[in-house]
Design a protein with these regions (language model features):
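Sec-dependent bacterial lipoprotein signal peptides
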Residues: 9-10, 14-41
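Short N-terminal or domain-adjacent regulatory/targeting segments
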Residues: 52-81
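Surface-exposed short loop/turn segments
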Residues: 136-202
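Bacterial Sec signal peptide processing site at the extreme N-terminus
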Residues: 38-59
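N-terminal segment of the mature soluble domain
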Residues: 78-165
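Extreme N-terminal basic, low-complexity initiation segments
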Residues: 2-7
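C-terminal, charge/polar-rich interaction regions
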Residues: 245-254
Length: 254
C-alpha cells in the first residue's frame, strides 16, 4: 500500500511539474506574439499623401481650367435641383491608402449642411445620383445622368483615407499582458482627403474644385483602439468642411 501511495504521489508531482512547464511555455509564446505585434507598429510611418492625391486624381483636378470658374456659359439660375454623386472606388485597401465608404449617414450629414440653402431659395431639391456604371473621371457621364433625373447641377463627392497606427512610450509595458488592456499606449491617426466639384448639366459651367484634408486621432490600449473610429471621425469632419465650402460656392453670385 505504501509503495502504491508513493507511486501516486510521484505521478501527481510529475503532472504538476509538466503543467507548470506548459504554462511557462504558453506564456512565452503569448509574450513573443505581443512583442512581435508591437514591433510591427512601433513607430509612426506618417501618411503617403502623394499616393492619396494620385488616387483622387488631384493633380489633374488642380489644372487651371478646373480651379477657375468657367465663364464660357452662364451659371444656371436658382433655385437649383442638385444631384449629388458619391464616388465609389473598387480598389483594395493598401498600407498607404484606404477606400472611403460613403454611408447613408454621411449623405444625410451633407444634405443637412446644404439644407439652409433651400430657405435662401438657392436649392429647390437635393437628391443622390445612383449609377454603379459611372466612375469619378467620367464627368460627362455623371452630368448626363444628372440631366436624365432633372438636375440643374451635379455635385461629385470623392474621397480617400489613410491610417497611421503606432505605439507611444507607454507600450513598453504591454508585455505585462495586463498593460495591453489598460494602458493608452497605442495611437491611431486617420487622414481623410475629400473633394467636391460642381458642374452644370446643360452647359459647360463649373465651379472650382473644393478640397479638404482632415486628420483625427484615437488613443487607448492596444486591445481596444479601433482604426475605424478614427476614420469615421475624420470623415465626419471632412463632410462638414466640404459641405460648408460647397454652400459658400452656391451662395456666391458668380
Amino acid at each position: 500500500m505504501a509503495a502504491a501511495g508513493e507511486a501516486d504521489s510521484n505521478r501527481w508531482n510529475a503532472m504538476r511539474r509538466l503543467s507548470r512547464k506548459v504554462t511557462q511555455y504558453s506564456f512565452r509564446i503569448v509574450l513573443a506574439l505581443i512583442v512581435a505585434g508591437l514591433a510591427g507598429c512601433a513607430a509612426s510611418r506618417g501618411f503617403d499623401q502623394a499616393a492619396m492625391r494620385e488616387a483622387l486624381h488631384l493633380d489633374s483636378l488642380s489644372t487651371p481650367e478646373n480651379q477657375s470658374v468657367s465663364h464660357e456659359s452662364a451659371r444656371p439660375s436658382p433655385p437649383f435641383r442638385l444631384g449629388v454623386f458619391f464616388v465609389k472606388h473598387d480598389v483594395p485597401d493598401t498600407p498607404s491608402i484606404r477606400k472611403v465608404e460613403w454611408l447613408s449617414a454621411d449623405r444625410d450629414q451633407l444634405f443637412r449642411k446644404l439644407a439652409p440653402l433651400r430657405d435662401e431659395q438657392l436649392l429647390a431639391d437635393t437628391f443622390v445620383l445612383v449609377d454603379v456604371t459611372l466612375r469619378s473621371d467620367n464627368v460627362k457621364g455623371i452630368r448626363q445622368a444628372g440631366a436624365r433625373f432633372g438636375a440643374d447641377m451635379v455635385l461629385i463627392i470623392d474621397g480617400i483615407a489613410a491610417v497611421d497606427r503606432y505605439n507611444n512610450r507607454l507600450a513598453w509595458l504591454y508585455p505585462t499582458l495586463l498593460g495591453a488592456y489598460l494602458l493608452p499606449g497605442t495611437e491611431s491617426d486617420a487622414l481623410v482627403m475629400a473633394t467636391g466639384s460642381l458642374w452644370a448639366v446643360r452647359s459647360d459651367w463649373h465651379a472650382p474644385i473644393q478640397t479638404v484634408e482632415i486628420q483625427s486621432k484615437v488613443k487607448g490600449s492596444a486591445a481596444f483602439v479601433e482604426d475605424a473610429t478614427a476614420l469615421q471621425e475624420a470623415k465626419q469632419q471632412a463632410i462638414h468642411s466640404l459641405g460648408k465650402r460647397i454652400a459658400e460656392v452656391l451662395q456666391s453670385p458668380k
